[in-house]
């Protein structure tokens, strides 16, 4: 049986070195890798040209390399400026849409006005009827309280302010 690998034989061709010289490439082959490193896939030798230029992924004129067709109003602008303008336009549209949605939510209900028949005094009267158990007109005075050695009667309003004055810290 022939143990020769046809791929390996390709690299042993008499003209192989000459082809590398013509193409001006360097063949990088990994062997005897560190045990802690793993391969996801072995893609064989890499052929790299001898002369390489650094590829910068981001520059002010980054889109120049991509050669997007641009509108006349966009010509001469940097990638950053074009990006900001596109975001500003999108943000403006989003803002307008959200305002429209909020407007619709607020004003989507029935648009009508009602008039109070027989005068505006009906409004507080009807409110009073709905909450009258919570309103206390002419409440009884609180029981007599001792204040500074004498018995004094206070209205609720007077007592509230008097008790605050008694409990207020010095210098207040």
Curated annotation (Swiss-Prot):
Its EC number is 1.4.3.2. This is L-amino acid oxidase. GO terms for cellular component: extracellular region. Transmembrane segments: none annotated. It is found in: Secreted. Gene3D superfamilies: 3.90.660.10, FAD/NAD(P)-binding domain, Guanine Nucleotide Dissociation Inhibitor, domain 1. Catalyzes an oxidative deamination of predominantly hydrophobic and aromatic L-amino acids, thus producing hydrogen peroxide that may contribute to the diverse toxic effects of this enzyme. Shows high specificity for L-Arg, L-Met, L-Phe, L-Leu, L-Tyr, L-Ile and L-Trp, low specificity for L-Val, L-Ala, L-Asn, L-Gln, and no specificity for L-Pro, L-Ser, L-Thr, L-Cys, L-Gly and L-Asp. Exhibits diverse biological activities, such as hemorrhage, hemolysis, edema, antibacterial and antiparasitic activities, as well as regulation of platelet aggregation. One of its GO terms (molecular function) is toxin activity. InterPro entries: FAD/NAD-bd_sf. It comes from Cerastes cerastes. It comes from the Eukaryota. It is an enzyme of class 1 (oxidoreductase). FAD binds at residues 44-47. N-glycosylated. Its cofactor is FAD. One of its GO terms (biological process) is killing of cells of another organism. Activity is increased by Mn(2+) ions. Inhibited by Zn(2+), Ni(2+), Co(2+), Cu(2+) and Al(3+). No significant activity change by Na(+), K(+), Ca(2+), Mg(2+) and Ba(2+) ions. Both isoform are completely inhibited by L-Cys and reduced glutathione. O-phenanthroline, beta-mercaptoethanol and PMSF completely inhibit the enzymatic activity of LAAOII, but have no activity on LAAOI. Iodoacetic acid inhibits the enzymatic activity of LAAOII by 46% but has no effect on the LAAOI activity. Expressed by the venom gland. Optimum pH is 7.8 (Cc-LAAOI) and 7 (Cc-LAAOII). Heterodimer; non-covalently linked. Substrate binds at residues 47, 103.
């Amino acid at each position: 049986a022939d143990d020769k690998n046809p791929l390996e034989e390709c690299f042993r061709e008499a003209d192989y070195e000459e082809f590398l010289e013509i193409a001006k490439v360097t063949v990088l082959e990994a062997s005897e890798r560190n045990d802690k490193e793993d391969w996801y896939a072995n893609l064989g030798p890499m052929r790299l040209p001898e002369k390489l230029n650094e590829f910068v992924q981001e520059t002010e004129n980054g889109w120049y390399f991509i050669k997007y067709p641009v509108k006349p109003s966009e010509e001469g602008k940097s990638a950053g400026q074009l990006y900001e303008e596109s975001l500003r336009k999108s943000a403006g549209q989003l803002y307008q849409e959200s305002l429209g949605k909020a407007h619709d939510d607020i004003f989507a209900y029935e648009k009508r006005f009602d008039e109070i028949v027989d005068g505006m005094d009906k409004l507080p009267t009807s409110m009073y009827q709905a909450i009258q158990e919570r309103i206390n007109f002419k409440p009884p005075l609180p029981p007599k309280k001792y204040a500074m050695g004498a018995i004094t009667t206070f209205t609720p309003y007077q007592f509230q302010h008097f008790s605050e004055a008694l409990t207020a810290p010095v210098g207040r």
